[in-house]
Amino acid sequence: MNKKQKKMLTRIIIAFALIVVLSLLPVDGYLEFALYMIPYLVIGYDILKKAFKGIRNKQVFDENFLMAVATIGAILLRDYKEGTAVMLFYQIGELFQSYAVGKSRRNISELMDIRPDYANIEKDGKLEKVDPDEVEIGSVIVVQPGEKVPIDGVILEGTTTLNTSALTGESLPRNAKPGDEIISGCINMTGVLKIRTTREFGESTVSKILELVENSSSRKSRSENFISRFARYYTPAVCYGALALAILPPLVSMGILHMEPQWGQWIYRALTFLVISCPCALVISIPLSFFAGIGGASNAGVLVKGSNYLETLAQTKYVVFDKTGTLTKGVFEVVGVHHNKLEEEKILEYAALAESFSTHPISRSLKNAYGKEIDQNRVSDVEEISGNGVMAKVDGVSVAVGNARLMERIYVKPIECHHAGTVIHVAIDGVYEGHILISDVPKPTSREAIAKLKKNGIKETVMLTGDIDRVAQQVASELGVDRVYSELLPADKVTKVEELLAKKSEKEKLAFVGDGINDAPVLSRADIGIAMGALGSDAAIEAADVVLMDDDPMKIVKAIRNARKCMRIVYENIYFAIGIKVICLILGALGIANMWVAIFADVGVMILAVLNAIRTLFVKKL
């Protein structure tokens, strides 16, 4: 609890104790009034002050005005205990609401805690702390164990383990070494690092994330806008309704029925009506549900730019994926070695050595698959033939590594491979020894993510790719994707998404998931754009509505489930609060519900709605 909340709790305890004591004392008349005014003013002076200020500023109709009128009216009717109790329980509800909002804000603040306070610059052999804003691109900063990485950069010296949980929501540490890119906001766990900055602080990952979270509250959902409009008209309406309830029945009794007007009874009913009608449960719990939902998602590594996007995400029925970097790793890997007489390891060794001077992605994948240190002294007479492959001598043996065209060039007949992927043929001393199959492999969780999306009510999953149809169909079949469009240019992807948008109903939403590279136009065009692992891509963060902090496809399932849970809680609160209030308003107008029922209909409903709202903070593990 903060200082203000502790002060309020003290006031509540004092007022409650005084009410209990006064209930046991045999006092009446002016003495009873004077004694009850003590707990009433202790607990309610700030509400009365706000109500008076609202009247003075011509902003009359709010919950402070309703509480002030209802409690003062009850006291004028000599219902001192009830009037004081209404104010007491209202303040208990306010304290509870303040605590719930504070808890949500603390969750957001934990994310905000990624903001670095300083950066270390080395000067004359000593470390000097400077403001991260003062560090220029290309500067060398030092990050010691336990410190936050203040600015994006590349590691020059040092190896370490990084804690990225504040960014990705995942607790598993990540190893980092010289040459690796490092993003701001993660915590250096072990070694001392020297980092060359690649961005200014204002453009760094941590700044982008904080900007997203801070601006998320400005984008309101339809539900929030409805509640704002509802409260604007509802509060004056119930005030006039209460006034009518206090005046019209007595006038009808006197003028038409010639009966006793019973002013006290009808004024009491009107005051009960006012207490019941307070819209706190709706006005507080609905924005809190979205606020907590966005906070909970942030802690799970899912940044949602506003509650309107959370609402759209909950209505998603179609999910379109870009293949490379989203469902697949986006890097070539050796997935098979089909050999003749020569051993598999020997073929990989010859291929890796022959390709050791090349910087082509396929060369890197061959060297990674070989997995041993490469001695380039064993390699000579390297000839790289553009578009075909490499010829070289390894340990004095002629080695040719490349495609079928290279084999034909040296008069070697390659064996056709029927598997989807890039085929690298290997010939040694003019004899065909086999081929190596290289492919962009699916991420480990892609298949599970597709299955869980379908289980969670997604009607259709679609994959878009620039790959040839045979490769695309194999990946789609392996992952369980419903439909695939292959051999697409970036502009074609936008066209396909527009076609899919035209086919669905207006209530059903379409999400596009991309890795942020060349995906900005499609992310903008979909009903909701999701950028996966896009921490380093400014264009993706700008264009996307939802940003996943890492490249795990299961985060998409988590994002949709969290959004649906949030919307379910929002509608539960709307139906529950309005339903209870309508019932109690009718009972109050008929004289069946007294002031104690009114207290439950106001404070009780608000507490239950707020308790329900803060459930959105907690994101279940999949």
Give each language-model segment a name.
Residues 1-31, 101, 110, 125-127, ...:
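Flexible metal-binding regulatory segments at protein termini and peripheral loops
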Residues 12-16, 225-257, 270-290, 571-600:
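Bilayer-spanning, highly hydrophobic alpha-helical transmembrane segments
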Residues 29-31, 36-122, 134-136, 140-141, ...:
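Actuator/coupling domain of P-type ATPases
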Residues 51, 79, 100, 119, ...:
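Residue-level signature of catalytic and energy-coupling elements of molecular machines
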Residues 52-60, 99-109, 288-307, 616-622:
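Juxtamembrane helix-loop transition segments at the membrane interface in multi-pass membrane proteins
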Residues 66-68, 167, 268, 278-354, ...:
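Conserved catalytic phosphorylation-site environment of P-type ATPases
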Residues 334, 338-460, 469, 481-497:
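P-type ATPase nucleotide-binding
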Residues 396, 422, 428-572, 580:
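Conserved ATP-binding TGD loop and adjacent catalytic N/P-domain core of P-type ATPases
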